[in-house]
Amino acid sequence: QPAATFLKGSLGSFSRGGLMVTHDGRVVYKVNQDRGLISHPSLNAARHTIFGVFDGHGANGEHVAAYTMREVPRRMALHPDSLDDPVRALEDVFVEINASLPASGINAFFGGCTAVVALVR
């Protein structure tokens, strides 16, 4: 049994909502549309970890970011090439997630998310 890649309790993610002060001095609290992901172990392999940052934007951006955050590790674990060709698997997974958004019930017409994902193995 190989040693764990990370010590138990050594990983974490933090995200915080912000605010905006308008030109007339009003304070407007903004919905936090960002999500972070640490999926360990991942891909059904003890030494594989998926890290991700999902920056939601526009209407429903927080929902698109949350949906994408949940779907990336799930779909990567199911992809037949995730261990042998993770670059191709990630490309396929993002295309699948984008195509599945309408059926998810999330209206992403005026919103979405930008993602950065890394697989450490």
Region spans (language model):
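PP2C/PPM-type serine/threonine phosphatase catalytic domain
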Residues: Q1-R121
